[in-house]
């Protein structure tokens, strides 16, 4: 049963040079218990997509359809969304979040402030303890200040803060960035445990190897568009879009294959899409790529590439 459905989602920022087309015509569905991975280069729209879902797009606007738990999120008033959805049903682990802890308050004080902000009036002590232990932290962490914690501990505190009101869906934006490999593994194992317990995630990352551990479905973002969407198995075993193929070929493997890089630079998001976003970097570009490609259906999703026009 579908619990998150996105149709024709657009998100734009205003700038002195005109609108920034950060998210352009994105579609995907998730069923209960499923998690999605969003991958792509920096500034491709990944974080904006996550912020659009939780309606925290500072300086920007979104339009289209986001159906979550049978409610049209974008049609709700800010007060309704804040009272009934934000942090209660959908929450977010922000990019670089472990640096956002307030240095002058203890961890416990910061948990209490979150609960106050979201109008919680139950047993806060019990809820905070439950949240801390769910991410494998000792309760003595609550009396400490952020500077007394390691990077991995701070990241787990941030995850616990996102989970404190037991949301159904958590958006995790680069949760392993700036952590060493050992701590990255601990965070990934924690997310896998939470997923096994029934929580759904949107994991935003530039690292496709990380997504292979958690994601049931994967969306590949490029130039503000989701150029390919499908099951994790299909994306890894039979990637369709040349950009997806390039990303996978850039991953080092134990087989000794030499990683390849994708030449060129991403397009400016100040330009409204009028042709394939990947045309200037694509080794397989054809004349038809000068037109904006539609979404061609695949076995488990879709691909935005004219090479599959004959297969629709």
Q: Across the structure, where does each feature detected by a protein language model lie?
A:
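Conserved ABC ATPase "signature" region
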Residues: 123-140, 248
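P-loop NTP-binding/switch modules centered on Walker-like glycine-rich loops
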Residues: 171, 175-257
């Amino acid at each position: 049963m579908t619990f998150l459905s996105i149709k024709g989602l657009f998100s734009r920022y205003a700038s002195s040079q005109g609108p920034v087309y950060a998210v352009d015509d994105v579609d995907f569905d998730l069923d209960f218990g499923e998690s999605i991975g969003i991958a792509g280069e920096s500034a491709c729209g990944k974080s904006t997509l996550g912020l659009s879902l939780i309606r925290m797009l500072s300086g920007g606007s979104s339009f289209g359809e986001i159906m979550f738990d049978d409610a049209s999120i974008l049609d709700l008033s800010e007060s309704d969304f804040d009272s009934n959805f934000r942090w209660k049903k959908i929450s977010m682990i922000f990019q670089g979040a472990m640096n956002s802890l307030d240095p002058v308050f203890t961890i416990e004080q910061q948990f209490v402030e979150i609960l106050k902000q979201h109008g919680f009036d139950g047993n806060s002590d019990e809820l905070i303890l439950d949240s801390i232990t769910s991410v494998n932290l000792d309760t003595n962490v609550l009396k400490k200040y952020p500077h007394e914690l390691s990077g991995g501990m701070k990241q787990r505190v941030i995850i616990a803060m996102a989970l404190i009101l037991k949301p159904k869906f958590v958006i995790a934006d680069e949760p392993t960035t700036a952590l060493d490999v050992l701590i990255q593994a601990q965070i990934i194992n924690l997310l896998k445990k939470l997923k096994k317990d029934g929580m759904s995630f949107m994991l935003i990352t530039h690292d496709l190897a990380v997504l292979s551990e958690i994601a049931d479905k994967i969306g590949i973002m490029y130039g503000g568009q989701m150029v390919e969407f499908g099951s994790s198995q299909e994306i890894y075993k039979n990637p369709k879009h040349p950009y997806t193929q390039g990303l996978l070929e850039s991953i080092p493997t134990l087989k000794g294959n030499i990683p390849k890089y994708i030449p060129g630079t991403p397009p400016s998001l100040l330009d409204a899409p009028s042709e394939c976003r990947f045309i200037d970097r694509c080794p397989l570009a054809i004349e038809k790529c000068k037109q904006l490609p539609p979404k061609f259906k695949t076995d488990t999703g879709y691909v935005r590439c004219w090479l599959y026009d004959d297969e629709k």
